[in-house]
């Protein structure tokens, strides 16, 4: 947990400084309190997934930027396993593995998400033009789109504009696992 908090802290501070934003300005852009942003930057607080999404959206950067460091090398071919990457964000009943962090050459990030039984998350709209590609690889889940929960059985896939309120839930007694490829229309170049 210490390493993760340190990564959150260093990344948040670096992005904020690159934008030349004060904590007040960052708070306005993200909807996260100045106090909470300061605690994260000092490594004193572990943000929830919902908070990380708000921060990523406010800074116009990819969520995966905060999950793990960008690879130092520029390898196009490398094997990654979800098992070694999977993490549980603090106070969220969801597991997350950043399969591919955001790369500006491709314009997307790919995340594996595991929803525990009974988990539900409503996501705020992403930046204009963002598209999500959800592929259910294990179990059944539901996806909220246009105010309606759509059943997503194992093996199903859905692409949708994610610049609106949407959500994910698992009403079953077994975990549901899905891959989410998020294509960003634009990402701030000074991320």
Q: Model-predicted segments: where are they?
A:
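Double-stranded beta-helix
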Residues: 171, 176-191
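Short alpha-helical DNA-recognition segment
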Residues: 20-38
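A short glycine-rich, His/Asp/Glu-containing loop-to-beta-strand
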Residues: 85-124, 180-185
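Short, charged recognition helix plus adjacent turn
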Residues: 68-95
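Short, conserved beta-strand element in jelly-roll/cupin
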Residues: 112-116, 127-143
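Short acidic-glycine-tyrosine-enriched beta hairpin
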Residues: 147-161
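DNA major-groove recognition helix of helix-turn-helix/homeodomain DNA-binding modules
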Residues: 50-65
């Amino acid at each position: 947990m210490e390493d993760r908090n340190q990564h959150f802290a260093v990344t948040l501070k670096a992005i904020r400084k690159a934008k030349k934003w004060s904590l007040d300005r960052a708070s306005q852009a993200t909807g996260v309190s100045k106090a909470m942003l300061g605690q994260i930057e000092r490594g004193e607080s572990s943000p929830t997934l919902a908070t990380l999404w708000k921060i990523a959206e406010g800074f116009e950067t990819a969520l995966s930027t905060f999950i793990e460091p960008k690879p130092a090398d520029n390898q196009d071919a490398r094997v990654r396993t979800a098992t070694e990457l999977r993490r549980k964000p603090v106070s969220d009943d969801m597991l997350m593995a950043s399969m591919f962090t955001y790369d500006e050459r491709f314009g997307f990030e790919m995340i594996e998400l595991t929803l525990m039984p009974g988990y539900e998350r409503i996501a705020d709209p992403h930046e204009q033009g963002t598209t999500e590609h959800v592929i259910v690889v294990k179990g059944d889940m539901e996806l909220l789109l246009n105010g309606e929960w759509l059943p997503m059985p194992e093996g199903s896939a859905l692409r949708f504009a994610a610049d609106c309120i949407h959500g994910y839930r698992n009403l079953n007694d077994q975990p549901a696992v899905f891959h989410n490829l998020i294509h960003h229309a634009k990402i701030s170049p000074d991320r």
